[in-house]
């Protein structure tokens, strides 16, 4: 385990050549349009995924295309991935990996440490160790302070995993809050301008902030001085008067809604972004709901079919909220039926309250019953519908601001049965403030009722049950979270509740419970709401994972005890008057936040 895994860089280069040769592009020219300047800025766009999945991750690809498709942007972007040859069968980077030379970009084979800018899209906080491993393999010092003395690239990070940028403040130079297409181009232009003025000058995040005219969505850690007293933040002093950081909203752009290229098999259309519902625990609530016009989406479907694409992903938080969903499904079906080869359609999430008989018939015509996550897993193709009732207790859900009645899902099950869908994946959450065993009994009762409805059809029900991990940027961001022991107890309670209703034998036949991996739960629970001092623990997590060592709760608690934090501070409830590490970007209405916490706290008082 401790022996270095040596890798032949020439083999990696040949693999890069082979996958680029297989790519199918739906726009010309490939990669980038001709640039109007000779002194182009070299950019790397880093995705924490292996190749196939990276081709449908439009978040990072939209940054890549925004730089490359604009003739007036003085930069050219290459992709940086978790290259398949440097990973094991589970797509984890080989332990103790040693390369003959620094890791390079996919297209132009530029060593990562020779780039001018690296843009990173983090889908979640747990992917930070993968990102840091890639940077390290590219010869880049991980700490921002260590890069000040050398000629290293600036690093811009964004995405849902950076909603609390302070946890990564010691690693990255600046953060894009909200959408990043327009801002990333402005940063490229600023670097270009500063380099022309003084080629030897060491450019900092502060320089970029002062050069960009509209910097309202750019968070630069070095511009904020934090004062700590023990584990608490007592003051945040900006470098100069800085308004609250706003969430950037890019205008509708083609490459945020469709794939401009494919791995030769799969392409994506994105009919909508965000969600219309206003649930206090969901990050999608704060992103704003946006829709794409149906016509250009369908035009790209034609291009996909013409190029022989056999998998099309319709990716949205809730496809059924899209106002033109009927037209989209009908036209998709018409085009696929005319194709000379079979095409599999994968749908994103469906809102059970919005499922009508008409929509289900259209989905049935498409045979689009497989959730997107099954595309690059070993998930067997079968009629499976993924729905998110979240919880069985209506009282809990009302307290969280969720207006949907989770028990209405039973009506959707009845409708789905009419078109032959008997297998369901249900997304559920446990561990909310004020939640009791009686509340979890309601979740068990709901799962049992669904199992009853599909039993005679040999239907299966998968319960994907996650603990509440209060997310910065949501109205539940100050809520405490359950311990690993409590989480396991809650899962057992739901399991026993279902068994008591349908019996042991039927439970074995029909029900499976999928939990969040323990290590991921532990890591996310302590870093998600921390401040920049958490970087020392992140580096320890990185060291363990790089060596292939698992992290248990005992080890993690030891690291926390040796830090400036306590376990209770990182995982417990945060008072309403406490200064949040992400205070400068906190856009949550304090009255809404207080209302949710007070409502749930009142439930506790009533129980007493």
Feature annotation, model-predicted:
Residues 1-31, 39, 45, 501-608:
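Radical SAM enzyme core and accessory elements
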């Amino acid at each position: 385990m401790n022996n270095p895994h040596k890798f032949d860089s020439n083999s990696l280069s040949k693999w890069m050549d082979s996958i680029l040769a297989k790519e199918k592009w739906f726009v010309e020219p490939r990669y980038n349009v001709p640039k109007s300047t000779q002194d182009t800025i070299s950019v790397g766009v880093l995705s924490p995924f292996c190749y196939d999945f990276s081709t449908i991750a439009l978040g990072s690809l939209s940054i890549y295309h925004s730089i490359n498709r604009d003739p007036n942007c003085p930069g050219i972007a290459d992709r940086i991935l978790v290259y398949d040859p440097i990973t094991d069968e589970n797509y984890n980077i080989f332990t103790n990996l040693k390369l003959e030379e620094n890791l390079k970009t996919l297209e132009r084979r530029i060593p990562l440490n020779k780039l001018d800018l690296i843009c990173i899209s983090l889908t979640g906080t747990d992917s930070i160790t993968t990102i840091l491993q890639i940077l390290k393999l590219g010869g880049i010092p991980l700490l921002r302070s260590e890069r000040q003395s050398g000629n290293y690239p600036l690093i811009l990070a964004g995405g849902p995993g950076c909603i609390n940028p302070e946890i990564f403040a010691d690693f990255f130079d600046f953060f894009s809050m909200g959408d990043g297409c327009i801002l990333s181009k402005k940063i490229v232009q600023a670097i270009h301008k500063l380099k022309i003025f003084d080629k030897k000058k060491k450019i900092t995040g502060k320089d970029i902030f002062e050069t960009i005219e509209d910097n309202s969505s750019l968070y630069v850690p070095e511009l904020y001085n934090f004062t700590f007293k023990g584990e608490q933040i007592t003051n945040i002093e900006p470098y100069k008067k800085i308004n609250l950081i706003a969430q950037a909203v890019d205008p509708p752009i083609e490459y945020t809604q469709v794939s401009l290229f494919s791995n030769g098999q799969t392409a994506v259309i994105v009919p909508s972004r965000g969600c219309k519902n206003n649930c206090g625990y969901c990050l999608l609530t704060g992103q704003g709901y946006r829709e794409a016009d149906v016509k250009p989406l369908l035009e790209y479907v034609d291009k996909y079919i013409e190029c022989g694409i056999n998998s099309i992903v319709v990716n949205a938080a809730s496809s059924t909220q899209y106002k033109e969903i009927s037209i989209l499904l009908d036209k998709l079906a018409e085009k696929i039926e005319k194709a000379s080869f079979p095409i599999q359609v994968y749908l994103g999430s469906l809102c059970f309250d919005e499922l009508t008989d008409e929509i289900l018939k259209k989905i049935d015509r498409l045979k689009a019953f497989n959730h997107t996550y099954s595309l690059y897993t070993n998930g067997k193709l079968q009629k499976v519908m993924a729905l998110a009732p979240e919880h069985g207790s209506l009282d809990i859900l009302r307290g969280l601001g969720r207006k949907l009645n989770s028990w209405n899902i039973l009506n959707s099950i009845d409708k789905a049965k009419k078109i032959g869908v008997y297998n369901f994946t249900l997304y559920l959450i446990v561990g909310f403030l004020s939640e009791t065993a009686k509340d979890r009994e309601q979740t068990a009762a709901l799962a049992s009722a669904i199992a009853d409805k599909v039993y005679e059809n040999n239907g299966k029900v998968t319960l994907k049950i996650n603990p509440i991990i209060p997310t910065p940027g949501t109205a539940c961001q100050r809520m405490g979270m359950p311990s690993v022991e409590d989480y396991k107890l809650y899962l057992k309670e739901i399991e026993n509740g279902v068994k008591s209703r349908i019996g042991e034998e039927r439970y074995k036949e029909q029900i499976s419970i999928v939990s969040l991996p323990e290590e991921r739960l532990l890591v996310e629970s302590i870093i998600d709401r921390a401040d920049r001092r958490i970087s020392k623990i992140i580096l320890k997590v990185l060291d363990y994972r790089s060596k292939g060592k698992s992290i248990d709760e005992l080890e993690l608690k030891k690291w926390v005890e040796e830090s400036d934090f306590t376990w209770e501070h990182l995982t417990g409830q945060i008072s309403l008057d406490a200064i949040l590490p992400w205070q400068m970007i906190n856009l949550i209405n304090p009255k809404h936040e207080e209302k949710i916490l007070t409502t749930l706290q009142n439930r506790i008082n009533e129980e007493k």
